[in-house]
Regions:
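Conserved phosphate/anionic-ligand binding catalytic regions in large, soluble enzymes, centered on
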Residues: 14-29
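Short cysteine-rich clusters marking metal-coordination/redox-active sites
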Residues: 150-154, 171-174
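Cysteine-rich micro-motifs
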Residues: 165-177
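Short Cys/His-rich "knuckle" micro-motifs
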Residues: 159-164, 181-182
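C-terminal binding/interaction regions
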Residues: 97-100, 104-149
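Short, hydrophobic/aliphatic alpha-helical segments
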Residues: 1-14, 153
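A structural-propensity feature for long, helix-poor, extended segments
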Residues: 44-45, 50-91
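C-terminal edge-of-domain segments
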Residues: 78-110
Length: 182
């Protein structure tokens, strides 16, 4: 099977349906792979770890294709959001220090939301996106926080979400409950 077809099917399966928004992210990710000359694993994924970082400027369907193809996720700390509600993606390669920002061009007049899927599917990535100057610095690597067990509920949370009261760790939910009763 053709790698692009396999990637599309994987994106659609992950996302749950096919739509214009997913197509935008799919084409954006393919364009980033092409422009940055990135190597894909057999699965099609580019970034098995944190070497690639994507800053998405929207929280739309398009981001699911970024997750699948570029391997950028919030949990790994290499997918971040700078919300401008634009279909724009800034991608950094930690190994090469290269970065790129691509922005979706305006839809031609007459293309509706309903027929946008066919429109975006029919275009090559270079026809859909402008490459613009990168507007930000490479984000720092994710800071993995120490975990603590809440002395009240027994659940574990990272140090950013724990408060110490009388020397005992409390998760934010238990802290809020305790403050309500006091």
């Amino acid at each position: 099977m053709d790698i692009k077809k396999m990637l599309w099917e994987t994106c659609a399966e992950f996302h749950g349906h096919e739509c214009g928004g997913l197509t935008i992210g799919y084409k954006a990710a393919l364009y980033v792979v092409e422009l940055m000359k990135l190597q894909q694993e057999a699965t099609g994924c580019v970034s098995a770890d944190e070497e690639l970082v994507c800053v998405a400027e929207n929280e739309s369907c398009s981001v699911d294709a970024i997750r699948v193809i570029l391997g950028c996720t919030e949990d790994k700390g290499n997918l971040m959001f700078h919300l401008t509600n634009q279909q724009a993606f800034t991608v950094f390669n930690r190994k090469t220090r290269e970065s790129i920002r691509i922005v979706l061009k305006a839809r031609p007049e007459g293309i509706t939301r309903e027929n946008s899927f066919a429109y975006y599917q029919s275009k090559e990535p270079a026809e859909l996106f402008d490459v613009t100057p990168v507007k930000m610095d490479l984000p720092e690597r994710i800071n993995l926080n120490e975990s603590f067990t809440c002395s009240c509920c027994g659940e574990t949370a990272g140090s950013n979400w724990i408060r110490f009261v009388d020397g005992k760790p409390l998760c934010l939910d238990c802290l809020a409950e305790q403050e309500e009763t006091n």
